[in-house]
């Protein structure tokens, strides 16, 4: 990361509550939400922030949602939050947790009001429409948890690894044309600001020249000591595969383990992709 970007994200760290001891609000406070611009990191990996040549969304699941009903009785629920990958900003995850915590002692007459409030606040924060669904626990009791992504698991490959900083040179192809669905549970990187580990699974769906599986796995493992936010890591994987492998079509889907009750799940694709049916919950989530 160049010095200009380091300065930008250091300013973000200083202005946000990442890595700092935070006070918790007793009542609803939308001012806790903190946006982070997408553009600087996209410029670093040569993704035009204004381009429509890639598509996708960011999906967040929040497992610790609670507020008070009109009689003061607590309500608990789960929330699913999603927004388009072309929003000007992402939401800083700690600020989202603190925002949701501010709802805990706040009174709302019904679920619909909670949904409308959250959607309005998050949309204002990132400068783009945010879809919010809030589900009482009784509605999600039968939710399926999947052991893994569909596809060929790369993690069974017996390879030697010694590079733990991002190395796209591992990526290569043969002349054979294929359509493949691949995945790995070995994705690990670190938060750009706090250096805390981020654990995830990644699925790669592509059509084109066959990508060398061993090299792809080494490439994914090379993120192990890399510092970047979840969304930025998935976009970097997408951009590197497009650059080094030049597939006809590509989708990269990351599903990360939760922190502070939240998990983040970005997808980037060369084709328009609908959110419906994509929010599958993996075993580590």
Swiss-Prot record:
EC number: 1.7.1.13
GO MF, one example: preQ1 synthase activity
Residues at the catalytic site: 191 (thioimide intermediate), 198 (proton donor)
Binding site for NADPH: 93-94, 259-260
Binding site for substrate: 91-93, 230-231
Pfam families on file: QueF, QueF_N
Pathway terms, separated by semicolons: tRNA modification; tRNA-queuosine biosynthesis
Catalysis: reaction(s): 7-aminomethyl-7-carbaguanine + 2 NADP(+) = 7-cyano-7-deazaguanine + 2 NADPH + 3 H(+)
Record-level GO BP terms: queuosine biosynthetic process; tRNA modification
GO cellular-component term (any): cytoplasm
Transmembrane residue ranges: none
NCBIfam families in the record: QueF
Subunit structure: Homodimer.
Functional summary from the UniProt entry: Catalyzes the NADPH-dependent reduction of 7-cyano-7-deazaguanine (preQ0) to 7-aminomethyl-7-deazaguanine (preQ1).
Family assignment from sequence similarity: Belongs to the GTP cyclohydrolase I family. QueF type 2 subfamily.
PANTHER family: NADPH-DEPENDENT 7-CYANO-7-DEAZAGUANINE REDUCTASE (PTHR34354:SF1)
Name of the protein in its database record: NADPH-dependent 7-cyano-7-deazaguanine reductase
